[in-house]
A protein has these predicted regions:
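Short, small-residue-biased leader/transition segments that mark boundaries at the very start
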Residues: 1-5
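Sec-dependent signal peptide cleavage junction
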Residues: 6-13, 18
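Extracytoplasmic small-molecule ligand-binding "clamshell" domains
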Residues: 15-21, 25-95
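Short capping/connector residues at structural and topological boundaries
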Residues: 45-48, 111-113, 117
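Ligand-binding "clamshell"
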Residues: 100-115
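A bilobed periplasmic-binding-protein/Venus flytrap-type ligand-binding module shared by bacterial periplasmic
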Residues: 118-123
Length: 123
């Protein structure tokens, strides 16, 4: 399901609605809070009053599968790790890179996206 969600934001399928919650989801397990910094389109960004993007859709799909409501908290990027560590948020999703320092304080999922940055010059 992750590839389908990501592909709806990147590539020739971009712009299509990638994920919609089923109407019959039992959300009796409560609410999970996702900490993010909604400034990294297409992973998480503002669309009106909503925070949307690849990470938001993956988080919603997980909550649907586990029976939780999803609450997304937008914050400064440097506040995400402390929010998870303190229990203010249940998890963080914000285009985060795995580092040894971060691995010492939180657990990471498997990688679901790889990015390559480049520098451009005049021809």
């Amino acid at each position: 399901r992750q590839m389908c969600i990501r592909d709806s934001y990147i590539g020739e399928d971009a712009g299509k609605t990638p994920y919609e919650s089923p109407e019959d989801v039992d959300r009796s397990n409560g609410t999970l809070v996702m900490a993010t910094n909604a400034e990294f389109e297409p992973y998480e960004y503002h669309e009106g009053d909503d925070i949307v993007g690849i990470d938001a859709d993956i988080a919603q799909a997980i909550c649907d599968k586990l029976g939780y409501e999803l609450k997304i908290e937008d914050m400064e990027f440097d506040s995400i790790l402390p929010a998870v560590q303190s229990g203010k948020a249940d998890f963080g999703a914000a285009g985060m890179t795995v580092t040894e320092d971060r691995k010492s304080s939180v657990d990471f999922t498997d990688t679901y996206a790889d990015a390559s940055q480049v520098i451009i010059v005049k021809k």
